[in-house]
Structures are given as C-alpha cells and as structure tokens.
C-alpha cells in the first residue's frame, strides 16, 4: 500500500536517503534507480541500474532504449548480485529502493535471496508496468514479504 514518509521510522528515512544517493551512480540518462540491502542496521549491499561488470557502457548503448534494455541489470538484481559477489547473505534483510516500484522479475530475485521486507519510494509508475507491479505485490504477499510503497 502506498504511504507517506511520515509513516516510516527515522532509520527507514535514512536508508531511503542512501538508496537515493546510490541511484545517482547510474549512468542511465533517463532512469536512475538505487537499491540497498540492510540487516541489523548495517549496510550489506548496494545496487543501481547499470551494465554488468566488465561490459563497456558506451553512450550509444545508453541512448538507444531498445539496445539499453538488452544490457541493463536492474538495481534490485545488482544489489543481490553484489551481495553474492562479496559473500554476503541477504537472508532476513530489508531492501530499500528509490526510483520505481519493483518489477515481477526483480521480485523473484528478492524472494529467492531471502529478503523479508522491501521499502520502495517512487513517484507514479508508468501505466505499462501495472500488470508487472500487480504480480510483484501478489508474490510478495504470498511469500510473506512486507512491501512498503511510498
């Protein structure tokens, strides 16, 4: 359910602020998304929408939407992959995401990684993603994941 920042505690607000900073690391000229994973008030992993490790992020790849989508790893999945790369478990963690709601593909990864709560801050999502975000909400509910949308 969509809420307001006033409903969150001070730690949620702080972590969302950090996820917002992480989103600025993305080189995507049109969409910047940031995700962080937190466990026991400790930052475990970060991710932003970008290309996989070692893949050149040429301007022509970023500026052509059709081409870009073939390369980009979503922030949530990058957060999961980065945790794995650094031998960090996301089991029982909270993921904070700034920019867009969680798509159904990222929801699957979040569930499989053992995240127990997701806090997503975003403005209105594009209508074309309505079905994807609807499926995300259903999967999170069924998996027992708390999903706070702001």
Residues covered by each model-derived region:
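Zinc-dependent deaminase catalytic domain
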Residues: 1-150
């Amino acid at each position: 359910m969509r809420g307001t920042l006033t409903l969150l505690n001070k730690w949620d607000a702080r972590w969302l602020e950090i996820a917002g900073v992480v989103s600025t690391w993305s080189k995507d000229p049109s969409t910047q998304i940031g995700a962080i994973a937190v466990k026991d008030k400790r930052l475990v992993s970060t991710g932003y929408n970008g290309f996989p490790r070692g893949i050149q992020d040429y301007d022509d790849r970023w500026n052509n939407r059709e081409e870009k989508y073939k390369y980009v790893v979503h922030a949530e999945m990058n957060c999961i992959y980065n945790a794995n790369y650094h031998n960090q478990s996301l089991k029982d963690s909270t993921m904070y995401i700034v920019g867009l709601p969680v798509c159904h593909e990222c929801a699957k990864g979040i569930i499989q990684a053992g995240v127990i709560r997701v806090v997503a801050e975003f403005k209105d999502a594009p209508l074309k993603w309505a079905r994807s975000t609807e499926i995300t909400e259903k999967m999170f509910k069924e998996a027992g994941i708390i999903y706070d949308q702001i």
